[in-house]
Amino acid sequence: MSLLKITTFQTYLFWENIDKNLEYLTLRLTSIRETTDLIVLPEMFNTGFSMNPDKLAEKMNGKSIKWMHEQAKKYKCVVTGSIIIKEKNNNYNRLIWMRPDGSYEYYDKRHLFGLGEEDQHYKAGAKKLFVELKGWKICPVICYDLRFPVWLRNTNQEYDLLLIVANWPERRSLHWRSLIPARAIENQAFVVGVNRVGHDGNEVYHSGDSMCIDPNGKVIYYKPNDEDLYTFSINKDVVTEARASLPFL
């Protein structure tokens, strides 16, 4: 049996205010009362879903990266979420996978949200990221990537857990609540989606709806509307049994 303990933080965000967001997150994370293997924050957790990278983008040695390392070291776990990064004259919506020792991996959002003009301000990534944690193979992606099942296809059982960080608006929450279980069932993997709550600077409301779905489509965790810092465990045996009983992959 291989258990993975995950802490998801469905949080309010302060619009385009890096310092205030990091200060708030630091305070709220102190509510974690048990050990955890992984802390998951939403997409652009330090700014909100902003199309203002010229003002907000940081380098890979910036304050938000340093903050992630501080939290990973403090809680002795991986910390992940996406931030705005500038690199070689391009801006990226970049997910950071930060370990306690300061080593990290990253994933640049592949599918940019054209309806929100994200493609006009950011450069798309080209490669998937697969990471390992406590014997689990994990594939982290960002928000709009959820709508592209071919990109997420678990062709060679490359992952046991698909992880989605998001700023997904309430007006399309039905899609979020439908697609996450679909990705879990078709890929015979756990799927964890972590969204924000509240209004952003464009008055777009986010209802959260963070969730964990097992490979059979069973709901392990679901939280609409309110801010929530929640820790739960998932069992890799569920993945093994699902794939053995229904060898579809």
Sequence positions of predicted segments:
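Structural motif
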Residues: 37-38, 138, 161
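Cys-nucleophile CN-hydrolase/nitrilase-fold catalytic domain and related Cys-dependent amidase chemistry
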Residues: 18-19, 23-100, 105, 169-182, ...
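Extreme N-terminal starter segment of soluble prokaryotic enzymes
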Residues: 2-8
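Active-site catalytic loop in hydrolytic enzyme cores
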Residues: 86-157, 171-178, 241-249
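Short beta-strand scaffold segments in enzyme catalytic cores
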Residues: 81-83, 94-98, 129, 193, ...
